[in-house]
Amino acid sequence: MPSFDIVSEIDMQEVRNAVDNANREISTRFDFRGVQASFELNEKSESIKVSSESDFQVKQLVDILREKLLKRGIEGGALEVPEQIEHSGKSWIVDAKMKKGIETDIAKKLVKLIKDSKLKVQSQIQGDEVRVTGKSRDDLQGAMALVRKGELGQPFQFKNFRD
């Protein structure tokens, strides 16, 4: 029976490249000239520390980071930015986390979305991924299109497509 897995993975090398590109851009931008602004990648905790001298500049920096991530092939939904901006001395800091893996509640929504579509496929949760099986390849491709359209707040990739 044909099947595929729905996963949510991030290539940390591409994240590192995007952070380097963003740091390079803020060093050449006129509106950040003479301002202590930076991006710091922590690969162990899979987070990016965005810091600047004012809160609106932090928001601009997050937009720059999202743009650079998108150019490197990482969707903006993979970056989880808290609403609260920390203020410490004369710097404003946001610790943005990268979403990796499918959480249980999102996996349940994904399974429900596929079941409610009346497609002739079965879906099951396997750890941090969802396996979808069906009798025909066309049904599986319909399920892929459905998942791409479904706004679940997280980017998904499809792998292990087997006939």
From Swiss-Prot:
Keywords: Nucleotide-binding. The keyword Mitochondrion does not apply. Pfam families: DUF520. The keyword NAD does not apply. InterPro entries: DUF520 (IPR007551), UPF0234-like_C (IPR035571), UPF0234_N (IPR035570), YajQ-like_sf (IPR036183). CDD domains: YajQ_like. Transmembrane segments: none annotated. GO terms for cellular component: cytosol. GO terms for molecular function: nucleotide binding. Nucleotide-binding protein. HAMAP family: YajQ. Belongs to the YajQ family. This is Nucleotide-binding protein ETA_25210. It comes from Erwinia tasmaniensis (strain DSM 17950 / CFBP 7177 / CIP 109463 / NCPPB 4357 / Et1/99).
